[in-house]
From Swiss-Prot:
Species assigned in the record: Homo sapiens (Human)
Domain Laminin G-like: 64-228
Main location: secreted
Molecular function terms, GO-annotated: calcium ion binding; heparin binding; identical protein binding; protein kinase C binding
Chain ranges of the EGF-like domain: 397-439, 440-481, 482-522, 523-553, 555-601, 602-637
GO biological process: commissural neuron axon guidance; fertilization; neuron cellular homeostasis
Protein name listed in UniProt: Protein kinase C-binding protein NELL2
GO cellular component, one term: extracellular region
Length: 816
């Protein structure tokens, strides 16, 4: 109900906008004949009178030709057409009777993105295209276009909606897979042929146009209805709603995360800090660490060597080191007995009687220090040492470092006989003359290392280390030698590649019969593997089920080889790669579509009126057929009813729409068969009996350009049945059994879809907006919409036919 209201509203809002004037905006128009600049010098075509005199018309002759847009012209076409879902193909034509040819073709390599074809052999118009899932599709419209008469044809494509008008009459309207116009570079545009060798259109074409606009058929038939928006317009509205829903869901999720973060941020003050030796410093804060000036920048400590000042000291003071500081500062001095002492320094003086007196520099004066007595020593007098700064002797080997010293980080205290001194650790150098502060020596930068060739020097605190270059292994702490990755099996070569050791590395080369860069080698099969086969070894193909042969070129006929046993009411029909059981004439499927044909049941021809009994007979239904019986006592004519007309008993006639089939009436039954071909008869109809055509000009070249077929030969190519008829190749889709199920899938390398019960496995998505999904955030999602599951980064969900289908993207996980 909601979808119908939405559509009516959309028609009211946008319907009037679709009623344009009959003039076409040139930016939306591709006038093919004008842009290709066809003329008298163009081989294979010539200008002739058309349906009207307003534009030029050209006769496409049965001669070799190459009507192909130049690269620049084709790209101009594709710039207007690329990634558009609303366009119309228009053409006025007069096609030669029985000709099968391509009107226009847009293809890249073997991929037909858009090709319009008319088959006079089978009396049908075909549209070949690729869908958004990159699968090839063919829509067949039964219609006699190749009748040597003028026709106006328009094919309007609007998203998944096709409308075919012929002579301003709507002939067909279908819902299909949405065609893709994501045309890659190198795509080609052909007119009147598929390529240089195939699909030659024979006849006259006029007014060949592509209109990239809604309801483009109006340009050809102005009186047609155009008051309501197109399917693409409606799909666009639905898409916008889905996009808005997705934006709303993402915005709500972002808002929820932002609120959570704000709640956490309200509880704390976040600032980048630095921590050094147990002390935390704020951003941009600077401090002195020994002889380094350090700063906290963006949470990282950056230090530089401190540059000490050299101040002028006042009278009775001089520069001296101060405990805990790197640079010298002005310090008071004392002059005593011709020597200079700094504040706090002590000195002993011995009298002539040997009495020791201790002095200390205080307030620029040497003052007497009272003696507090000395501890008893436990060493002989010969091992006792007299000190210059104390009246108390110590034993030899006394630990002066245990008392007090000024040796900082990376400097160690060493005991001398009468005092302690500082010494830099190995690998460090002094920052001042007393060795109290030291810094690391970068042996690598200064060339003071022993690393040899094939190594790289890496500085470490107080030392260095030599690491091996890539492709080398260690001999000792300073040397490395070449590493043969091939012998040690430490290479990345493919199992089908040969490893060759090189200096510092190795090379990988694919073995004969394989191709690739060495790290990845794939088997190479000279003739290729057809029908989905995989090349698994040099010139060895692994064929999919249903095919055999060196190149998987031969279809296995399951029907004739006895692999299949169909029900007695069904015939086995072989298809490329597989088969199916099709109900015999007189039977139809009951809707269960049993694979073996058990679901075939009798058709009551009498009850349904599908019989040929004349009015003077009575129809009796039989299993798989019927009987025309004459009532007792009456003299029946044995006439037949065919296509609403009376055919007399014994009468023979040719079908109106199939000149190659002959029918006869025999006692109320109509029996039809193909014409018997007598190749000895000089008047034999070569159209019906192509096998009787010996002319070389009637032969056909296979699409691969290698195989030559005689007229009448048939073959299968890319899920199409192809036939050579008097030099023309005509291909049509292989018949597939009906798939009466909600969900279907087209397996890879197969031609016909199969039913599946899991909607997430289905290939196609029905664009029914009434089938919605409710996601994990309680947001309504339309069929076809996709989203990233809330709380995840790599789980992609999609609404398919009202079901939520989710999968994890492996590439996304690798990028995290």
């Amino acid at each position: 109900m909601e979808s119908r209201v939405l559509l009516r509203t959309f028609c009211l809002i946008f319907g009037l906008g679709a009623v344009w004037g009959l003039g076409v905006d040139p930016s939306l128009q591709i006038d093919v004949l004008t842009e290709l600049e066809l003329g008298e010098s163009t081989t294979g075509v010539r200008q002739v009178p058309g349906l009207h005199n307003g534009t030029k018309a050209f006769l496409f002759q049965d001669t070799p030709r190459s009507i192909k847009a130049s690269t620049a012209t084709a790209e101009q076409f594709f710039q207007k057409l690329r990634n558009k879902h609303e366009f119309t193909i228009l053409v006025t034509l007069k096609q030669t009777h029985l000709n099968s040819g391509v009107i226009l073709s847009i293809h890249h390599l073997d991929h037909r993105y858009l090709e319009l074809e008319s088959s006079g052999h089978r009396n049908e118009v075909r549209l070949h295209y690729r869908s958004g899932s990159h699968r090839p599709h063919t829509e067949v419209f039964p219609y006699i276009l190749a009748d040597d008469k003028w026709h106006k044809l328009s094919l309007a494509i609007s998203a998944s909606h096709l409308i075919l008008h012929i002579d301003c009459n709507k002939i067909y309207e279908r819902v299909v897979e949405k065609p893709s116009t994501d045309l890659p570079l190198g795509t080609t545009f052909w007119l009147g042929q598929r390529n240089n060798a195939h699909g030659y259109f024979k006849g006259i074409m006029q007014d060949v146009q592509l209109l990239v606009m809604p309801q483009g058929f109006i340009a050809q038939c102005p009186d047609l209805n155009r008051t309501c928006p197109t399917c693409n317009d409606f799909h666009g509205l639905v898409q916008k709603i889905m996009e808005l829903q997705d934006i709303l869901a993402k915005t709500s999720a972002k808002l929820s995360r932002a609120e959570q973060r704000m709640n956490r941020l309200d509880q704390c003050y976040c600032e980048r800090t630095c921590t050094m030796k147990g002390t935390t410093y704020r951003e941009f804060e600077s401090w002195i660490d020994g002889c380094k000036n350090c700063t906290c920048l963006n949470g990282t400590i950056q230090c530089e060597t401190l540059i000490c000042p050299n101040p002028d000291c006042p009278l009775k003071s001089a520069l001296a080191y101060v405990d805990g500081k790197c640079c010298k500062e002005c310090k008071s001095i004392c002059q005593f007995q011709g020597r200079t002492y700094f504040e706090g320094e002590r000195n002993t003086v011995y009298s002539s009687s040997g009495v020791c007196v201790l002095y200390e520099c205080k307030d620029q004066t040497m003052k007497l220090v009272e003696s507090s007595g000395c501890p008893a020593l436990d060493c002989p007098e010969s091992h006792q040492i007299t000190l210059s700064h104390s009246c108390c002797k110590v034993c030899k080997g006394y630990d002066f470092c245990s008392e007090r010293h000024n040796c900082m980080e990376n400097s160690i205290c060493r005991n001398l006989n009468d005092r302690a001194v500082c010494s830099c650790r190995d690998g460090f150098r002094a920052l001042r003359e007393d060795n109290a502060y030291c810094e690391d020596i970068d042996e690598c930068a200064e060339g003071r290392h022993y690393c040899r060739e094939n190594t790289m020097c890496v500085n470490t605190p107080g030392s260095f280390m030599c690491i091996c270059k890539t492709g080398y292994i260690r001999i000792d702490d300073y040397s490395c030698t070449e590493h043969d990755e091939c012998i040690t099996n430490q290479h990345n070569c493919d199992e089908n590649a040969l490893c060759f050791n090189t200096v510092g590395g190795h090379n990988c080369v694919c073995k004969p019969g394989y191709t690739g860069n060495g790290t990845t080698c794939k088997a190479f099969c000279k003739d290729g593997c057809r029908n989905g086969g995989a090349c698994i070894a040099a010139n060895v193909c692994a064929c999919p089920q249903g095919f055999t042969g060196p190149s998987c070129e031969t279809d296995i006929d399951e029907c004739s080889d006895g692999f299949v046993q169909c029900d007695s009411r069904a015939n086995c029909i072989n298809l490329p790669g597989w088969y199916h059981c099709e109900c015999r004439d007189g039977y139809h499927d009951n809707g269960m579509f049993s694979p073996s044909g058990e679901s075939c049941e009798d058709i009551d021809e009498c009850g349904t009126g599908r019989h040929s009994c004349a009015n003077d007979t009575i129809c009796f239904n039989l299993d798989g057929g019927y009987d025309c019986r004459c009532p007792h006592g009456k003299n029946c004519t044995g006439d037949c009813i065919h296509d609403g007309k009376v055919k007399h008993n014994g009468q023979i006639w040719v079908l109106e729409n199939d000149r190659c089939s002959v029918c006869s009436c025999q006692n109320g039954f109509v029996m039809c068969r193909r014409m018997v071909c007598d190749c000895e008869n000089p008047t034999v109809d070569l159209f019906c009996c192509p096998e009787c055509d010996p002319r070389l000009s009637s032969q056909c070249l296979h699409q691969n350009g290698e195989t030559l077929y005689n007229s009448g030969d048939t073959w299968v190519q890319n899920c199409q049945q192809c036939r050579c008829l008097q030099g023309e190749v005509d291909c049509w889709p292989l018949p597939c059994p009906d798939v009466e199920c909600e969900f279907s899938i087209l397996p890879e390398n197969e031609c016909c879809p199969r039913c599946v019960t899991d909607p997430c496995q289905a290939d196609t998505i029905r664009n029914d907006i009434t089938k919605t999904c409710l996601d994990e955030m309680n947001v309504v999602r339309f069929t076809g919409s996709s989203w990233i599951k809330h709380g995840t980064e790599c789980t992609l969900c999609q609404c398919k036919n009202g079901h939520i289908c989710c999968s994890v993207d492996p590439q996304c996980l690798q990028e995290l």
